[in-house]
Amino acid sequence: MKNKKVNENTEKLPVLNFNKQYMNNTKISRILSTKPILLDETYAQLRIEINDKIINLVDVWRDENITLSRDDITPFDLAVMDAAYTIMCSGKMILTAEWIAKVLSGNPKQKITKKKIEAIRQSIDKLRYIHIQIDCSNEFNYRKDTKNKISDFKYESYLLPLDKITAVYQSNGKEIIAYPVLSKPALYRYAETIHQIVDVPADLLDTHEEYRDTDEAILIKRYVIKRVAQIVSNNKLNSNKISFLWYDREENEERGLFPELGYIPDNTRSWRNKKQKINKIVKMTLKSLKDKGAIKSFEEYRENDTKNPAFPIMGYKIFYGL
C-alpha cells in the first residue's frame, strides 16, 4: 500500500514552469566551487574575506561513513544548486534530475540523455551529504541595518537539504527518483540576506538554436549570462568585460572564465583547440543575448587592448543601455 501511494504521488508531479533563473553570486559560492577543498568527516574551515573589514568563517564537512562520487565541489555542482534553487523559487518543493537538466540548459523541450540524468543525480546525492555552516556574525555586525544588534549569526544546512523517493513501476520497470525539499539551502538563505542572488529571464538560457547543450557548453553559457547580468545590473562593478583570464592583485588570485570553470591553460595544441571552442560558445551566447535585446552589442578585446589580430583574444566588452 505504501509503495502504491509513493507511485501515485510521483506520477502526479506537476509540470515545471518558471520565468526566471536564479544564480548564487556570493564570494562563498565561488570559492567553494573553484578552490581545492578536501571533504571529510572533520571541519574544513575557510576564512573568506568579503572586504578588509569583513571576514566570514565557513565550515564544510560530509556525513560520516559516506562515500562521495567526488571529494570536491565543482562548477557543475554549483550549477545544479542554482537550478534546484530556481525550481524552489517557482514554488515547487520536490525536485527531479530531469527538471534540473531542463533548467540547466534553459530549453524546456530538450531531450534529456540517461548520461546527463546520471551525472545530475550523482551531484545531487553528493550535495545531500555535505554540510555547510556560514558564520556571518562579523558581516552582520558591519551592516548598517544589523550593526550592534546581533552578536552571533550562523546559517547551517546541507548544501542541498533534500529527502529522496525512489519508485519502480511494475508495468514497465521504469524507475522514478524524486527529491522532496526539506528546507531552503543555507548558502542561498545567506545570499538572499546580502542581496547576492542574480536573476535573469529564463529564455536567455535557451540557446539550442546556437549550439548543442553539452555539459561544457551549459557551464560556459551560464557563466557568460551571469557575468552579463552582473554588468547590466551595475553590481558595484568597474568593468564591462567578460575576461577569460586576469589576475586579481587584491585577492592575489587568478580570475576569469578559465580558472572559475576549472580550465588550466598551457601551450599544447589540445589547449589551443579547446580555447577556440570555448571562445566560440562565448561568442554565440553573446550573439543570442544581443538578438534577444539583453545587451546592445559586444566586441572582443585583445591583450594590451590592441587591435592587432596577432595578439590573443582576452575576452569581450559588453555594451548595453540606450
Question: What do these predicted regions represent?
Answer:
Residues 1-322:
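Charged, alpha-helix-forming regions
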